[in-house]
Amino acid sequence: MKKDPFHNSTVFWDTASVFVHHYLPDIRKVSPNTVIAYRDSMNFFIDYLDTQQNIKRKDISYNDFSKDTIRSYMDWMLNVRKLSPKTCNLRITAINSFLKYSTDQYPSLMAIYVAVSSLDMVKTTRKPIEFFERKQMKALLNAPDPRTRTGRRNRMMLILLYDTAARVSELLELTLD
């Protein structure tokens, strides 16, 4: 029979470890950067519980993931830490993802997941997308020297990045099959 996940810190830590080190990279196949972002988000929440809620790290359990605690964490991130709404939302999304994963392992945690996931995200304002003017784009694409192999490669990379809106890291991971 499985241990009570609500008050057992070992269950929490074991599940958190599997979530970060196995589930995200091996099952969900998210990028290494996403794994790092989710791990850091979990660590920031754990630090908050330790420093602001006076819950020792070794004593943290799912019982500490109440809707009120998450709401106060959001307020603390915005008003004390002065984090951007986008950063706050990222950290809450990571917690929600972890809790959703946890319900697969321990269905009795569903009430916690539902309560926390019902919290509204922080409203964000979208900045308008600024585009290069034709003259700027032409200057950028003409910057690499077309007489050299490296220049032609760099120009092609710039064109590919612009046309696909890919990140440089995504472009570098492309391989020929």
What do the PLM-derived regions correspond to, one by one?
Residues 1-177:
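Conserved catalytic core of the tyrosine transesterase superfamily
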